[in-house]
């Protein structure tokens, strides 16, 4: 079987892991790498991500990459604060027939709830080129897709659903992303993620998509933001030393009201230290260990409590995208949702 030829975009914290996965995957061939940092231009992709030389030289020249006529783009770059640019970046490739697997174009999670100015150009480009688009998600994606839907499919009736996502981000180096959540700031200040359209496009659309799966209409969506500091300094990868009194834990609660009651709730809890905000939802799994924990609570005829901890949880984000590439390349053109394609298997070694 011919290998799928892939161009990767982005070599940040997640991108490096994603590019490494592409290099390792025997079903894929890395043929191009788009980078934003001038110091990375001209370097071998393997050198950038800590792998042996590949012969693929990083570039910032999109036209040169377009000429490669690859099967798929694996988009790992951040779109925070640059949504329009990120859309424009991939449109020519979609128009040329190159498929797109992305962790970052969040409006495509459930396009009918995304911002039209970001969704429409992508859909039109895919239609023109006969290409496919799949957003796999960033945190790491499956908890609001296959995992949740499989759980709900095992129940006869449901009264309420609560999803809690918890991450220890002390060793996460994404400074700008954490600033969007208000870390290392005054806890009284509402951060950009809560006050701008960004948060709505990330999570409100997701809740509406889950409501569609439940075949229910959302009557109202409410959001609440909490931030707490600690009384001791914290050493972090993103900020260096975070002083006492600065935001060290954030909790974002988004609730979808259906049938006259709060039926679906999502909470995202991030901590710069595992002992921050002890009064909030926590986990004994991997305590003090970098990773991502998901808890799912379902009340209904068959009540359910599930907790899943991934020690290298953030690494799942690019891995899910890379595993999906062969399926997306072979799928019908258009926008794909996670439930549209089969569960993608890992490599066995």
Where are these regions (language model features)?
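Alpha-helical support elements that line or immediately flank enzyme active sites
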Residues: 142-153
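N-terminal glycine-/serine-/threonine-rich beta1-alpha1-beta2 phosphate-ribose binding loop
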Residues: 1-95
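Rossmann-fold NAD(P)-binding glycine/threonine-rich loop
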Residues: 87, 104-131
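Gly/Ser/Thr-rich loops at beta-strand to alpha-helix junctions
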Residues: 12-14, 81, 107-110, 114-115, ...
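Active-site-lining helix/loop region of Rossmann-like oxidoreductase modules
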Residues: 9, 153-280, 311, 318
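C-terminal helical cap and adjacent loop that interface with cofactors, partners, or active-site loops
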Residues: 274-275, 282-349
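Conserved active-site and cofactor/substrate-binding residues in soluble primary-metabolism enzymes
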Residues: 9, 13, 17, 68, ...
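A short hydrophobic/small-residue beta-strand
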Residues: 99-101
């Amino acid at each position: 079987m011919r290998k799928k030829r892939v161009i990767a975009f982005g070599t940040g914290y997640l991108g490096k892991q994603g590019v490494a996965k592409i290099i390792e995957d025997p079903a894929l061939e890395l043929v191009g790498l788009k980078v934003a940092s001038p110091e990375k231009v001209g370097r071998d992709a393997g050198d950038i991500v800590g792998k042996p030389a590949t012969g693929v030289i990083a570039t910032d020249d999109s036209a040169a990459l377009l000429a490669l006529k690859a099967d798929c783009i694996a988009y790992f770059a951040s779109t925070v604060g640059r949504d329009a640019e990120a859309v424009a970046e991939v449109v020519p490739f979609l128009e040329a027939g190159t498929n797109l697997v992305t962790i970052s174009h969040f409006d495509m999670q459930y396009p009918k709830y995304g911002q039209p100015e970001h969704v429409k150009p992508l859909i039109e480009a895919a239609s023109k080129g006969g290409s496919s688009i799949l957003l796999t998600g960033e945190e790491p994606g499956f908890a609001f897709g296959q995992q949740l839907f499989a759980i709900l499919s095992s129940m006869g009736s449901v009264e309420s659903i609560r999803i809690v996502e918890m991450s220890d981000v002390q060793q996460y180096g994404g400074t700008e992303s954490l600033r969007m959540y208000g870390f290392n700031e005054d806890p009284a200040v509402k951060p950009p993620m809560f006050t701008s359209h960004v948060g709505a496009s990330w999570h409100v659309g997701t809740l509406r998509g889950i409501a569609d799966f439940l075949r229910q209409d959302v009557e109202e969506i409410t959001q609440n933001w909490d931030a707490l500091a600690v009384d001791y300094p914290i050493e972090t990868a993103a900020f260096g030393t975070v002083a006492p009194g600065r935001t060290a834990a954030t909790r974002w609660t988004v609730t979808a009201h259906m049938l006259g009651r709060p039926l679906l709730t999502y909470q995202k809890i991030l901590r710069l230290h595992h002992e921050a905000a002890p009064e909030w939802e926590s986990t004994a799994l991997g305590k003090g260990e970098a990773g991502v924990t998901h808890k799912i609570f379902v009340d209904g005829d068959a009540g359910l409590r599930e907790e899943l901890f991934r020690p290298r949880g953030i690494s799942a984000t690019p891995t899910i995208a890379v595993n999906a590439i062969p399926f997306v390349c072979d799928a019908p053109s258009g926008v794909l949702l996670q439930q549209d394609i089969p569960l993608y298997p890992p490599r066995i070694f």
